[in-house]
Amino acid sequence: MDTLAVVIEGPERLALNRLSLQSPASDDVLVDVEWSGISTGTERLLWSGRMPNFPGMGYPLVPGYESVGRVRAVGSKVSSHRVGDRVFVPGARCFGEVRGLFGGAASQLVVPAQRVLGIDESLAERGVLLALAATAYHALAASGARPPDLIVGHGVLGRLLARLTLAMGGDAPTVWERDARRRDDSAGYLVVAPEDDTRRDYRSIYDVSGDAHILDAAIARLAMGGEVVLAGFYVEPLSFVFAPAFMREARIRIAAEWKDSDLHAVLEHVQSGRLSLDGLITHRHDADAAGTAYRQAFGDADCLKMILDWRYTA
C-alpha cells in the first residue's frame, strides 16, 4: 500500500512523491484525504530550513497537521468511526523511514482512531482550520487568562483569536496589523496600524505575529500589572528592556501547542454557530501543484490560508 505525499527533502526542496504506507493496525483508521492546509508558521520554518532542532527533526519529512478526509477503512477494534465518516486529522506517522512532521499532507493516511475527530459534513474544507482555532483557544483558555484587549497580527490565527474572544463573551479587542491589505474582515472589532493607536493601558496583549522584537513595543502599551501573551512561534531570541517592564510590573506568558480538549472545545463553538470559520481560506491548489502552492503560501501577502485539494490527485 502506498500514498502520494508532499515531501520536504531539504530546505526549499519540495516534491510530490509516492511513499510506502504502513498497514493499518486493529485500532487504526485509513483516511482518504480531501484537503490539507499549509501552515505559514511551522511549515514555513520546516520548508525554509529555519526550524530550530528538536528530537525527531530531520529531512526528508512529510509536513502538515491540518487535514480533512473520509474514513475508507477501520480496524477491528475501532468503534468510534465508521467508513464514510468525514474527519479532521492532525497529522500522521505512517510513512516508514520518512518522518511525519507532522505528516498530514498526503492522499491517504493511516492514523490511530483516537487521533482523528469526526466533523460535520457542512464544514468541508473549512475543517482544516480547526488546528489553528484550537491554537487560539488554548491561549485564551489557560488558567487565569484574561481575554485580549489587543491582538498583534491579523493573519488567520489573529482573526480566529479575535472571533473566539467575542464567541467566549469577551469585549471586542483592538488588532494591530502593519500590512494595509490585511486590515479587512474585522466584523465586530477594530483593526489599525500600530502607529495609529494611542492607547497605553492594555491589560492583556496577545502576540500572534511571530515577531521576535515585539516585546518592547507591547510592554510600552501595557497598563500596570498587564500581561503579554506570546502565542506565536519565534525563531530568534526574544529580549526586552527591563525598566519599562519593571515600572508596569509586566507579566509575560507563553502559550504552547493545543491539546485534544482544545480541539473538542473549538469544534463545539463551531457547531453551535458561535465561531465562524468563513472567509479565512483564500487560496486553493490541486495537490499536483504543491510546489506552486507552498511558494505562494509563503510569499504572497494576499494569501491568508492556502489549502491543497487531494480529491482529484491520481
Feature map (PLM): residue ranges:
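C-terminal hydrophobic helical "lid"/dimerization subdomain
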Residues: M1, D216, D260-A314
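NAD(P)H dinucleotide-binding glycine-rich loop of Rossmann-like/cofactor-binding domains
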Residues: S80, V87-V152
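N-terminal Rossmann-fold cofactor-binding loop
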Residues: W176-D179, V208, A256
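Short, well-ordered coil/turn residues at beta-beta hairpins
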Residues: W35, P90, Y206-V208, W310
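Glycine-rich phosphate-binding loop and adjacent beta-alpha segment
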Residues: A212-S272, W310-A314
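Glycine-rich beta-strand-centered segment in the early N-terminal region that forms part
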Residues: Q22-I38, R50-R93, S122-A124
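Mid-domain Rossmann-like dinucleotide-binding core that forms the NAD(H)/NADP(H) cofactor-binding site
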Residues: L123-D196
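A short acidic, Gly/Pro-enriched loop at the edge of an enzyme's catalytic core
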Residues: D197-I205
